[in-house]
Amino acid sequence: DNFERSNFYLYLSNFLNSKFIYNYSLTVENYYLNEDYEKAKKILKNFKKEDNFYYWYRVKKEAQLIAKQRNKKESLNYITVEFNKISNPNDKILFDIANFYKNSKKYEEAIKYYTKVINTADDISEIKSDLFYRRGGSYERIGKYEKADDDLLNALKIDPDDAYILNYLAYSWLERDYKIKEAIEMLEKAYSLKSNDPYIIDSIGWAYYLNEEYFKAEKFLKRAVELMPNDPIVNDHYGDILWKLDRKIQARYFWGNVLEMDDAEKDMIENINIKIIKGLVNS
């Protein structure tokens, strides 16, 4: 198959030029994607501390393997210890550790390192736009909405046609019942740019729901749940619109789906249990 063929050529290349370290990273990625974690760990031993760039790649990948094989807390502890050994980390390493903290929901730490990279990044580069987007998302997750909005709007000043930034900011405004009209306009623009993205489809459907355009909302939310049947938020949203359209048995079915999903958050599960019993309040 493609996996075995790819590895064959990588091994051949390594045999012919064992000093071409990049090939080892491709082999690691192959094993990682194929969930052969022990072989991935074995190949990672080729990356030595003397080579800062590739050794940091090894640390990141080992942290990911720890998360897969053991737990995320141990993974975060490992990468933090290794990061703290670096006396003068470059922007790439700072960016990576910020992303790791963000993905681990350690948003204050993520913000600290994103800020360091932002302070050195080119003012109008796409990289700076991405940094504002990531830091803005971190601020949003801890409820610092003014700072979040500033960062996300700054990202859009640099890259006004980034569908994902438009989507994130607009959805945040919807959740806060803030600037609904502008949020819908942003989502319509995001949808025109990425009409097949399930997250954007869900967001625009939810915007129409909040704007009480229920038939319009159902069309988008149905498509979102078809594209992401295992996403708890999408199932929750689709259940809500079905309830509004008086399709209550179906609504409870989709709400019930959420209870079976591992990544459904605790407060969402509590809310779903109430809705299954009582339906939507004031509806």
Give the positions of each predicted feature.
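Canonical tetratricopeptide repeat
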Residues: 26, 61, 96, 134, ...
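Residue-level recognition of tetratricopeptide repeat
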Residues: 29, 64, 99, 137, ...
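Short coil turns that delineate tetratricopeptide repeat
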Residues: 18, 52-53, 87-88, 122, ...
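TPR alpha-solenoid repeat register
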Residues: 22-23, 57-58, 93, 127, ...
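Hydrophobic/aromatic packing residues within the alpha-helices of TPR/SEL1-like helical repeat arrays
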Residues: 10, 44, 79-80, 114, ...
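Conserved structural position within tetratricopeptide repeats
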Residues: 14-15, 48-49, 84-85, 119, ...
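Register position in tetratricopeptide repeats
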Residues: 33, 68, 103, 134-137, ...
